[in-house]
């Protein structure tokens, strides 16, 4: 009887538990529903009902203890559930991904919606019937669990021994488990994820909320039976089904709790400890998976940020890379060009919603050229890259050209459109030549601007200057009428030019790769949307162009050179290419169009004017005359060459006969002198030798002749080249002022195209002599160890004084060694016994050997001979003749730099005047001797 009475108290105990929990079957939001892990006791009890009936005879004290422990256990679990829910809620995305992985591993497919609804209705009917049966059984005195109750799903810690079929598991009701940490995944979690700082909606490409399945356990734990999986699938169908399922769990949990109350205290404690371990394992796995998910999100964000940093947007107008909210750098979705909103005149309210404004932007942006569907050519420069603006006449110009070229105006200053070119003077087209254009055929196209530094005469195109980083803009704080200015390379800031040049190169490389990368990144739907939007813009632009009023143009048609249009030049070059005409063989003559000797203009710019037409026909007539004249001159040249060959033969014969006569004359002169001396001895008087018997007077060579003695009295009529040893093309022979040899212009190394310019203070030397000077300098620099190293060596390399060592005084009456000759005029002479030496070509090896024997002394310049002031090698120059030093400013006229140039020598003004006086004195003496000889010849006749 006692046992039966105790057994009857199970129902009030379960009711008291429900009242203590404030449970309401209509609202189960206070609980987190999961697997029936708490019904393990009932599951075990169902396996052995006799054991439950045997345990029903426990004392009242044991029941009270059990009730208190259950209450404490429930309170602890509620606190743990709240804490775990707060930790798990930010990781909804993680749980969803884990559920998706489990579904892929299990290979389960969701059932159709209709089948699920039918199964739900059947389960609800069964639940109602079982609820009524359980109520009636609880009211009766029976202490065992009903046989119709299905077996509970066991947790992984307690293995089950019952096996059920799939149909039984589908119809199996769910159990109420208080120890299951299972958060409710509703769509409120989407808002929480969006509120997170590191959340990006584009990273959730694999998240499909419509097919989300709610899991019963974490991915780290073992899955339950098939019945559990079916229950989980049912729970993912909607919020209403979740509430119904949780309500069913409540109905089926009451008999399980009653059966659990009949167990021993030891078994209850062991089960509680096992569940606690399970709970801690769940929390650990959830925390680990949450940390892994956070690391993955951080890695994705870093990769995305690094990818964005690799493509820093640069404005193609100002070459700046600062993008602010008030002035963003926008990118065209068609051509990929990037520009600031302010630099392009984009309206921030209507046009600034572009593809690069945000990662989730929906409105594409296009530049004006893409909207009109054209590939424009600038009217002001020959370059084709960059961003364009349309003029009021339908032409196109670079926006940077319109900003920097004077005379260009805008209809709307804020939007920088339309561009007006009629206010600019047409004479500027092709007036100046660009100094930066790589192709000289485009140097006079468009309009060139000048350097803004004072009186600088450098001219260049705007876009050519932009390539070199020479464009500048005044600060916004400065109130300047024209804030855009440009400098040449000489006057531009070096650091400013460096970073602008760097940004320009980066912009060019990015624009080439951006289109390919954007096509790869964009999906076909996004690309189709962009193309559709572009077609809409082009249709609007075509409509606006047809309805746009005509721009004002001057009444008189202004002529403009055809060569000033870059597009026309390209088309003409293309035409020449198709016709098979090479455009490289025609030199570009951009010289000034000055009049020729006969008063006719040599060249006129092509234009649609009557003046150019007259010039064109006149040029054709002149071309015919020139061709006829060339044919005549060619015939004359052939005749003269034949005559020259005959004359060369006669000349050689005459030279041979002249030498014979000179030898005979010398013999006769010596015989006459002997006879005349004999007559003097006979008479005993010293007789004057007649002029006819006198030898030709030996005279000193002038300084202009370089101090060399003539080897023969034979006049030199034809000169031979020192390299090819031929005497043709006498007009192309060039005299070296150092070695006194003649050279053809084409025989030199490197060949010359024209005669070098000589002045009174400078002269020219051949490459062989110049190489000798450079070898002298190398030997000198090898011996010197100067403190200022590089600067001193560079300066001395450029100095032309490098042939005669200063410590060796010139020796009179001796010819100096040719390998050590000076660049100045030589003062040494050849004695009479050595004057018949033949001139032998010099060899490099002998010269170098002599140089090694006689190294040149160090050239130290300390005092100016004019002002007697001190100086050094930086501000003094030494004369090659008198070896005196002069300040640059003490010369007449004063100079700012050294007058010496590489390959040329230099003498002071005094030496130049003295040499001219000596030449005059020698000429006077020669004339006097000729007059004396004439006087002596006349009385004999």
Swiss-Prot record:
Biased composition range(s): Acidic residues: 60-72, 194-205, 226-249
Listed Pfam families: PHD, PHD_2, zf-HC5HC2H_2
Compositional bias annotation for Low complexity: 36-47, 133-166
Domain of life: Eukaryota
Expressed in which tissues: High levels detected in testis, lung and spleen and low levels in muscle, heart, intestine and kidney (at protein level). Widely expressed in adult with increased levels in intestine, colon and lung.
Gene Ontology, cellular component aspect: chromosome; cytoplasm; nucleus
Modified residues (Phosphothreonine): 280
Chain intervals with Basic and acidic residues compositional bias: 74-85, 94-109, 116-132, 829-843, 915-928
Chain positions recorded as Zn(2+) 9 binding sites: 879, 882, 908, 911
GO MF, one example: zinc ion binding
Classification via SMART domains: PHD
Keywords noted in UniProt: Chromosome, Coiled coil, Cytoplasm, Metal-binding, Nucleus, Phosphoprotein, Repeat, Repressor, Transcription, Transcription regulation, Zinc, Zinc-finger
InterPro entries: EPHD, Histone_Mod_Regulator, Zinc_finger_PHD-type_CS, Znf_FYVE_PHD, Znf_PHD, Znf_PHD-finger, Znf_RING/FYVE/PHD
CDD domains documented for this protein: ePHD_PHF14, PHD1_PHF14, PHD2_PHF14, PHD3_PHF14
Gene3D superfamilies on file: 2.30.30.1150, Zinc/RING finger domain, C3HC4 (zinc finger)
Residue sites binding Zn(2+) 4 per the record: 434, 437, 461, 464
Ranges of biased composition (kind: Polar residues): 281-290, 930-941
Zinc finger (C2HC pre-PHD-type): 375-408
Annotated residues for binding of Zn(2+) 7: 736, 739, 766, 769
Any one Gene Ontology BP term: germinal center B cell differentiation
Residue numbers binding Zn(2+) 8: 864, 867, 887, 890
Functional note: Histone-binding protein. Binds preferentially to unmodified histone H3 but can also bind to a lesser extent to histone H3 trimethylated at 'Lys-9' (H3K9me3) as well as to histone H3 monomethylated at 'Lys-27' (H3K27ac) and trimethylated at 'Lys-27' (H3K27me3). Represses PDGFRA expression, thus playing a role in regulation of mesenchymal cell proliferation. Suppresses the expression of CDKN1A/p21 by reducing the level of trimethylation of histone H3 'Lys-4', leading to enhanced proliferation of germinal center B cells.
Protein name: PHD finger protein 14
């Amino acid at each position: 009887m006692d046992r039966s009475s105790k057994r009857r108290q199970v129902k009030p105990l379960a009711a008291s538990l429900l009242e203590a929990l404030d449970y309401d079957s209509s609202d189960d939001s206070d609980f987190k529903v999961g697997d029936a892990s708490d019904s393990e006791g009932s599951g075990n009890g169902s396996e052995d009902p006799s054991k439950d009936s045997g345990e029903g005879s426990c004392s009242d004290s044991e029941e009270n203890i059990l009730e208190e422990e259950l209450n404490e256990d429930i309170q602890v679990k509620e606190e743990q559930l709240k804490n775990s829910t707060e930790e798990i809620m930010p990781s909804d995305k993680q749980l969803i991904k884990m559920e998706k992985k489990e579904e892929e591993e299990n290979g389960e497919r969701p059932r159709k919606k209709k089948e699920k609804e039918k199964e739900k209705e059947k389960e609800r009917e069964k639940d109602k019937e079982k609820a009524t049966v359980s109520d009636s059984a609880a009211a009766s005195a029976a202490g065992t669990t009903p046989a119709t109750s299905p077996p509970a799903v066991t947790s992984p810690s307690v293995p089950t021994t019952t096996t059920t079929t799939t149909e039984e598991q589908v119809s199996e009701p769910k159990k109420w488990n208080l120890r299951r940490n299972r958060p409710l995944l509703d769509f409120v979690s989407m808002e929480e994820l969006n509120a997170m700082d590191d959340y990006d909606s584009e990273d959730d490409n694999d998240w499909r909320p419509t097919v989300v399945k709610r899991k019963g356990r974490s991915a780290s734990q073992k899955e339950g039976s098939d019945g559990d999986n079916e229950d989980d699938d049912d729970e993912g169908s909607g919020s209403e089904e979740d509430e119904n399922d949780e309500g069913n769990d409540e109905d089926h949990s009451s008999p399980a709790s009653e059966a659990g109350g009949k167990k021993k205290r030891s078994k209850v404690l062991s089960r509680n400890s096992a569940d606690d371990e399970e709970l801690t394992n769940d929390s650990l796995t959830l925390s680990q998976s949450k940390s892994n998910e956070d690391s993955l999100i951080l890695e994705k964000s870093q990769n995305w940020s690094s990818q964005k940093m690799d493509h820093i947007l640069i404005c193609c107008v100002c070459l700046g890379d600062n993008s602010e909210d008030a002035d963003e750098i926008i990118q065209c979705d068609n051509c990929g060009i990037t520009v600031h909103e302010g630099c392009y005149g984009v309206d921030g309210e209507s046009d600034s919603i572009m593809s690069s404004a945000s990662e989730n932007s929906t409105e594409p942006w296009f530049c004006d050229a893409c909207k009109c569907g054209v590939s424009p050519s600038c009217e002001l420069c020959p370059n084709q890259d960059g961003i364009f603006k349309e003029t009021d006449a339908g032409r196109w110009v670079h926006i940077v050209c319109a900003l920097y070229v004077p005379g260009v105006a805008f209809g709307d200053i804020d939007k920088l459109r339309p561009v007006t070119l009629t206010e600019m003077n047409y004479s500027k087209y092709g007036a100046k030549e660009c100094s930066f254009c790589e192709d000289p055929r485009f140097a006079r196209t468009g309009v060139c601007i000048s350097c803004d530094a004072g009186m600088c005469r450098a001219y260049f195109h705007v876009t050519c200057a932009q390539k070199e980083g020479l464009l500048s803009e005044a600060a916004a704080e400065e109130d300047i009428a024209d804030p855009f200015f440009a400098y040449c390379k000489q006057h531009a800031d070096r650091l400013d030019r460096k970073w602008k040049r760097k940004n320009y190169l980066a912009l060019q490389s990015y624009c080439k790769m951006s289109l390919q990368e954007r096509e790869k990144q964009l999906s076909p739907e996004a690309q189709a949307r962009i193309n559709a939007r572009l077609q809409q813009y082009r249709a609007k632009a075509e409509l606006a162009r047809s309805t746009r009023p005509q721009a004002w143009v001057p009444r008189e048609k202004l002529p403009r050179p055809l060569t000033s249009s870059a597009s026309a030049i390209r088309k003409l070059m293309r035409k020449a290419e198709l016709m098979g005409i090479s455009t490289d063989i025609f030199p570009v003559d951009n010289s000034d169009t000055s009049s020729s000797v006969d008063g006719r203009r040599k060249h006129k710019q092509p234009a649609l004017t009557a003046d150019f037409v007259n010039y064109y026909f006149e040029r054709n007539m002149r071309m015919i005359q020139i061709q006829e004249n060339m044919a005549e001159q060619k015939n004359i040249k052939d005749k003269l060459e034949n005559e020259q060959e005959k004359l060369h033969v006669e000349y050689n014969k005459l030279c041979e006969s002249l030498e014979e006569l000179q030898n005979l004359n010398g013999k006769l002169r010596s015989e006459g002198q002997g006879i005349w001396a004999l007559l003097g001895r006979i008479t005993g008087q010293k007789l004057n030798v007649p002029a006819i018997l006198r030898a030709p007077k030996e005279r000193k060579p002038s300084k202009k002749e370089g101090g060399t003695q003539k080897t023969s009295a034979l006049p030199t009529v034809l000169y031979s080249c020192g390299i090819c040893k031929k005497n043709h093309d006498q007009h192309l022979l060039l005299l070296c002022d150092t070695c006194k040899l003649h050279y053809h212009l084409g025989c030199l190394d490197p060949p010359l195209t024209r005669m070098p310019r000589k002045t009174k203070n400078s002269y020219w030397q051949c490459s062989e002599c110049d190489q000798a000077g450079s070898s002298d300098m190398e030997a000198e620099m090898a011996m010197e160890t100067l403190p200022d190293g590089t600067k001193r060596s560079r300066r001395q390399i450029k100095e032309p004084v490098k042939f005669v060592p200063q410590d060796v005084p010139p020796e009179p009456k001796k010819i100096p060694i040719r390998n050590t000759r000076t660049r100045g005029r030589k003062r040494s002479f050849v004695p009479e016994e050595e004057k018949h030496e033949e001139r032998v070509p010099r060899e490099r090896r002998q010269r170098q050997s002599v140089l090694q024997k006689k190294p040149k002394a160090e050239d130290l310049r300390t005092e100016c001979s004019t002002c007697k002031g001190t100086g050094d090698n930086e501000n003094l120059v030494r004369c090659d003749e008198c070896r005196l030093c002069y300040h640059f400013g003490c010369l007449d006229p004063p100079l700012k730099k050294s007058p010496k140039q590489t390959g040329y020598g230099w003498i002071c003004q005094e030496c130049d005047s003295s040499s001219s006086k000596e030449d005059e004195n020698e000429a006077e003496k020669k004339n006097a001797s000729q007059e004396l000889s004439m006087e002596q010849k006349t009385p004999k006749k």
